[in-house]
């Protein structure tokens, strides 16, 4: 029997026994800490379908999707709700360890409007700005739209709503009735990652196809009352919450690897590039502040250009090399060529780069099991520092450049063999840490009021679509806020076989002189890709 004191009436033993409530795992708790300590706002996936859908279609597919993947229908239940925010910032909570994490549960009653940000009063003001900006930009996603959405907070610990919302962007041609083909999946990262966002739209498109091709059984009453989940009615149809991925994959590093980890962490702190402006200091989000604000910039590469990039990688490295190390090399070479960032001092010889990865690849080879982890914050990643001097590659020095690409690829592969891909998150899961430290306090002290350095480069991969189907995902853009994670730069990559590859680039304001200098760098980065990919 679980101890549910402090979580009642939202958590019951019956829910736990049915598999519709459980405690969070260590990795899930990490992202919950970022949110409840106001150190992260959101990440987003922007999607364009090939044609519009109406409200009835959207309600139907959301109902089916949330029943099949209960992770999408869950919320985090904090202690002392509705006074949880004060509790989690109190000395009473922060002064001692809590080895047992909070619960998650399937939401008892969920309506269409609980999922759609357009219809929620607390977001009315920002939604008006978002809709107007999208129309002003000719119904296209731009950096201006991304910068409007980036600071939006999805509150943690609401028993009636999940950790994500869907924005339905206005349509250009409605033919007299409202349809949508442009959407934004917005989440606080709890129970979700970039791959989850891509999967969400892939699954929506498949279900829209199913409705059009085969029809769909539904109750007219459902359409009228707009209820997506009525737990008492639907619980037998709702899948069980999967175990935390940390119960399936051991993130914890061997104790023998800790001396090296702590030594490299010390070097990162004292010998790597750091920002120097007061405006780049990491901070908590608040309604009245401009904390962690960034400039964004979008780059697009057509399917033909992506094929050319892949061909050059294959020619100059080998068949197995992926896009990410090429993008990383171009990014770092362009930073060096900008000649506006690095001081070249003796105490600034490294630049750190984090590459998140999809931890689902380490799950057992069981199709049904893997499918149950389609949604969730199931990430790992490598985090290395590289010599700034190695980015100095003159124009035309192809051999040196492609050697750098191969080196980055090899380091990423090695991180799987030596455990580096999980150690950063795994250290926080060690028993002697969890049992003796308050994780909220530990992370807040480590992340807040710090200068930034380095880049986080995320590539959610290629989404392949069948364009002969009635519905398919035409385009995807992945973006995430800087938060208090101490990175100065962000580079988020997402691709479809229909419209090619999009990159959302971001820099925390104050890292470079102004937006103009940032845009100059982004253009230089684009030119660097063109130079080495022969575009």
Curated annotation (Swiss-Prot):
Membrane topology: Peripheral membrane protein
Protein known as: Alcohol O-acetyltransferase 2
GO molecular function term, any single one: alcohol O-acetyltransferase activity
GO BP of this protein: acetate ester metabolic process involved in fermentation; response to toxic substance; steroid metabolic process
Organism: Saccharomyces cerevisiae (strain ATCC 204508 / S288c)
Catalytic activity: an aliphatic alcohol + acetyl-CoA = an acetyl ester + CoA
The keyword Acyltransferase appears for this protein: yes
Active-site residue numbers: 189, 193
Endoplasmic reticulum as UniProt keyword: yes
Matches recorded under Pfam families: AATase
InterPro entries given in the database record: Alcohol_O-acetyltransferase (IPR052058), Atf2/Sli1-like (IPR010828)
Protein's job: Can use acetyl-CoA to synthesize acetate esters from various alcohols, producing ethyl acetate, isoamyl acetate, isobutyl acetate, butyl acetate, hexyl acetate, heptyl acetate and octyl acetate. ATF2 seems to play only a minor role in the acetate ester synthesis, compared to ATF1. Plays an active role in the detoxification hydroxysteroids and possibly certain phytochemicals, in association with the efflux pumps PDR5 and SNQ2.
Location of this chain's protein in the cell: Lipid droplet; Endoplasmic reticulum membrane
Effect of disrupting the coding gene: Results in an 18% decrease in isoamyl acetate formation and causes a 13% reduction of ethyl acetate formation. Leads to the complete elimination of acetyl-CoA:pregnenolone acetyltransferase activity and consequently abolishes the esterification of pregnenolone and increases the toxicity of pregnenolone.
Keywords: Acyltransferase, Endoplasmic reticulum, Lipid droplet, Membrane, Transferase
EC number(s) on file: 2.3.1.84
Family the entry assigns: Belongs to the ATF1 alcohol acetyltransferase family.
Stretch list, region Membrane association: 19-36, 515-532
Predominant place of localization: other
One CC-aspect GO term: endoplasmic reticulum membrane
